[in-house]
């Protein structure tokens, strides 16, 4: 369910905000246009939001500033603690994309950034099925995450990272479950979503999926 990577995020939590602001050279291109990525997710979401993978609360803060009501889900204790310090009073629950507490309000948007790739392709499909069950009619799933158009494109980025001496990035791309866009598209369409993709940098795409009937 993506929880096999929790230890990585427990260690990364104190430095995560440095990474997203470009202070970590290995991840500079991954987080390129970070503010625009967050803004794109906020602008395409509706009013009652369920956010998976809250992390240190950067997207959550923008959602709240836009006047949205947010329930956050985050499996990392260290990340939750940082987010709660940033955003006192916000509801951030222990959980993941598949296992999370019973919700206390109707949900018309499910959002996430830099987290969906922690699920295997099979788990992604299971999560998408649950998204359809949770969302109100015409609700939206809006994710920003690393994915690739082809397996070759993914391998090219791994090879480039190694050539640049970015060992941690190369190992990250090999270890975690960064998907191919066609696989994600097929999963959303299987569960009756209309889905589109928008590229934001060399790694990250925005997924916008609207629940149909």
Curated annotation (Swiss-Prot):
Gene3D superfamilies: Vaccinia Virus protein VP39 (3.40.50.150)
EC number(s) per entry: 2.1.1.-
Binding positions for S-adenosyl-L-methionine per the UniProt entry: 53, 74, 96
Keyword Chaperone set for record: no
Cysteine pairings via disulfide bonds: none
Alphabetical keyword list: Methyltransferase, S-adenosyl-L-methionine, Transferase
Gene Ontology molecular function terms on file: S-adenosylmethionine-dependent methyltransferase activity
Source domain of life: Bacteria
Name of the protein this chain belongs to: Uncharacterized methyltransferase OB1106
């Amino acid at each position: 369910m993506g929880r096999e990577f929790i230890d990585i995020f427990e260690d990364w939590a104190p430095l995560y905000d440095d990474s997203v602001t470009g202070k970590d050279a290995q991840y500079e291109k991954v987080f390129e246009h970070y503010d625009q990525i967050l803004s794109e997710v906020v602008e395409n979401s509706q009013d009652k939001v369920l956010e998976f993978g809250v992390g240190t609360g950067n997207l959550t803060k923008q959602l709240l500033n836009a006047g949205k009501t947010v329930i956050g889900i985050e499996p990392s204790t260290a990340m939750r603690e940082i987010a709660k310090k940033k955003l006192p009073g916000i509801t951030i629950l222990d959980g993941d994309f598949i296992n999370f507490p019973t919700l206390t309000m109707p949900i018309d948007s499910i959002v996430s950034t830099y987290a969906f790739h922690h699920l295997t392709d099979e788990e992604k499909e299971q999560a998408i099925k649950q998204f359809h069950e949770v969302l109100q009619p015409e609700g939206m799933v809006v994710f920003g995450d690393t994915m690739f158009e082809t397996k070759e494109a993914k391998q090219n980025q791994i090879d480039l990272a190694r050539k640049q001496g970015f060992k941690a990035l190369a190992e990250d791309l090999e270890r975690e479950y960064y998907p191919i866009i066609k696989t994600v598209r097929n999963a959303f369409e299987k569960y009756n979503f209309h889905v589109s993709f928008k590229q934001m940098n060399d790694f990250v795409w925005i997924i916008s999926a609207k629940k149909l009937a």
